[in-house]
Regions:
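C-terminal substrate-binding subdomain of Rossmann-fold SDR/epimerase-dehydratase oxidoreductases
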Residues: 1-122
Length: 122
C-alpha cells in the first residue's frame, strides 16, 4: 500500500499560485509526487523524532479498526500540479518540522482517545 502526502505550506502555495496565475486548467489533484509505503512512512516518522522503529505486525484484528488507511494505494496523478509548481517539501522534512512544532505547542494540541482505543483493543 502506498500513501501520498502533501504539506500544508505546499497546499497554500499552490492555492496562491492558482489565484494569482489564473491557469487554464480548473481541476487539479494535489500531493507530493513521491508516494511511500506504510513501512517507509513509519520509518520517516520515527526518524523525525529521533527514535528507533520497532515494527509489530498485528494478526487477527481487522486493520480498519485501528489504522485510518485502507489497504489500497492512495496515489494521485499530480502532473498538472507539478507543471505549475515543480518543487514541494520532502515528506521527511515536513515530518521533522511538524514534530518540532508539536514539541513547542504540545499544550495547544487537543488530544483524542484514539491511542487509548488502540491500546485497549490490540
Amino acid at each position: 500500500m502506498k500513501l501520498q502526502f502533501f504539506h500544508v505550506e505546499d497546499l497554500c502555495r499552490f492555492i496562491e499560485l492558482l489565484l494569482t496565475e489564473h491557469p487554464a486548467e480548473r481541476i487539479y489533484n494535489v500531493g507530493n509526487p513521491e508516494a511511500v509505503t506504510v513501512n517507509e512512512w513509519a520509518q520517516l516518522c520515527y526518524d523525525a523524532v529521533g527514535a528507533n522503529l520497532k515494527t509489530v505486525y498485528v494478526e487477527g484484528h481487522p486493520q480498519y479498526r485501528y489504522f485510518c488507511f485502507r489497504d489500497y494505494d492512495y496515489y494521485l496523478d499530480v502532473t498538472k500540479q507539478t507543471n505549475l509548481m515543480p518543487d514541494v517539501k520532502p515528506l521527511a522534512e515536513g515530518l521533522k518540522e511538524s514534530y518540532e512544532w508539536f514539541r513547542q505547542n504540545r499544550d495547544a494540541v487537543m488530544h483524542r482517545p484514539y491511542a487509548e482505543y488502540i491500546d485497549a483493543n490490540i
